[in-house]
Regions:
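Polytopic alpha-helical membrane proteins, predominantly small-molecule transporters/carriers
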Residues: 1-109
């Protein structure tokens, strides 16, 4: 259940970030306002995750997966391109997240 809540926190945070980008610097205030809602929801869900998971590990997973998902979405929605350094860096972040979640004994401390 903790991983499901963490996934939901990640998805809501990614949604908030994408809405903030879509707001175009708050020119489209509806998107900006929606982003505040989703950031708040993400924080509430993440707080529930922290009841059962160590903050360092939970935050590493949350931020790592958020970076990967936002990067993918930016390619799809805004046709953003990345050089080799950015791609390798993102791969390292995702690799670290996978290692932490599969091998670390501190996940549920």
């Amino acid at each position: 259940m903790t991983y499901l809540l963490l996934a939901l926190a990640i998805v809501t945070e990614v949604t908030a970030t994408l809405l903030l980008k879509a707001s175009n610097g708050w020119e489209k205030w509806e998107y900006g306002s929606a982003s505040i809602f989703f950031y708040s929801l993400s924080g509430i869900i993440f707080a529930a995750v922290l009841k059962n998971m160590g903050v360092g590990v939970a935050y590493a997973i949350w931020s790592g997966m958020g970076i990967a998902l936002i990067t993918a979405a930016s390619v799809v929605f805004w046709k953003q391109t990345f050089d080799m350094y950015a791609i390798v860096g993102i791969m390292l972040i995702v690799s670290g997240t996978i290692i932490i979640t599969s091998k670390s004994a501190v996940v549920f401390q």
